Amino acid sequence: MRRAKIVCTLGPATDGYDRTKALVDAGMDIARFNLSHGTHAEHEERYQQVRKASDETGHSVGLLADLQGPKIRLGRFTEGPVLLERGDTFTLTVEPGAEGDRHQCGTTYPGLADDVTPGERVLVDDGKVCLQVTGIDGPRIHTTVVEGGIVSDHKGLNLPGVAVSVPALSDKDEADLRWALRTGFDIVALSFVRSGRDIDDVHRIMDEEGRRLPVIAKIEKPQAVDALDDIVAAFDGIMVARGDLGVEMPLEQVPIVQKRAITLARRNAKPVIVATQMLDSMIDHSRPTRAEASDVANAVIDGTDAVMLSGETSVGKYPVETVRTMAKIVEAAEEDVLAHGLPPLTEHNKPRTQGGAVARAAAEIGDFLGARFLVAFTQSGDTARRLSRYRSPIPLLAFTPEPATRSQLNLTWGVETFLGPHADSTDAMVDQVDELLLRYGRCRKGDTVVITAGSPPGVSGSTNLVRVHHIGEDDTPH
């Protein structure tokens, strides 16, 4: 059983029900909808295809709506892409409606002229083109091309070291968020997060719509790295988005940030995704490079909950093969990690709450007894996430009456989720475990499982109970 989850970005290469179902069969756990591209109608069709494929295969798939965020972009070039050569002069302008040519182009960010100063760099298209600011004349930012290349419509701009004053949510993001909430998505990701306070507007809109979802903070700005503790505390999970992060800060720092982010998220029992260019060469080739295989494996060894595919699945030539390849790499890395048994407690992972201590006790009891499964009964997913963070080699099953929780736990390491009725007592929990695990052939009579839950049942965040149970046997104390 693979423990780390796979997030796949949907796009033109995955369109059509048969392709979507093939992704699910190959191992997709979370379908990511990149709302920077496409229309609501296109995304709605993909949404329906994923839900149908999930129902038909019986493989739960969570749906993640990834908001564009305050991404600064170029405007439109009147006559198509333009080649900028080293030493050329090029002007960025915030004048409304400015058309682009080989001498100038507009930008989506009206405050650009106020935020940059001469000498600073402006990077275009993830750093492929580098401009240096030479002067500012009202709404016009004059630059010299330091590294040339082709620029075209709506390419992204990065301003390394510049604290831009854009809001956390654009008007487009608000419209996309409301659409995602009404459509029925399971998880939301917020781009270009800079502080824990950035979640406030998202929660305000969710409350207006009457639906709170987990919000994942994308770590892709130096300000986010500086505020990582604050962000992990405020958000429901994080994504290490290495594309923009590697443009905004020195490349050699990105692996260090990745390891720190994974450690911090695990300490707080929050899911963490490692993303961007994991199997990038498979956009065009049927096999990854050795370095890419090592990258995926090392993210798993570091302890990430999930690894993500972007262009590899959304526009690549081999989307299904890429998912299969990633699954094989993950499983091979985990075979080595899990062979070491239950990881010992350290200063970084020791429990700091009652729920965390109870979850650790369940993991250790399971280890001592050679349990077949650890079982978490959970309303919100909290109990399962607390158990997951200890990375026990014993498979972890979550039982929940909430369909949304089932989908959301697809992002958490090692959790396989069963949907069942609300259990109003510990005896009802035991009966449900016996029935489902025997029905699906997951256990034999007499197998040991360790159950953890909250008592009274149904109270979110109240993990306080551990029970050792032998499948199919009445082990209630008399």
Predicted features along the sequence, with ranges:
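Non-catalytic helical/linker scaffolds that mediate oligomerization, partner binding
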Residues: 1-478
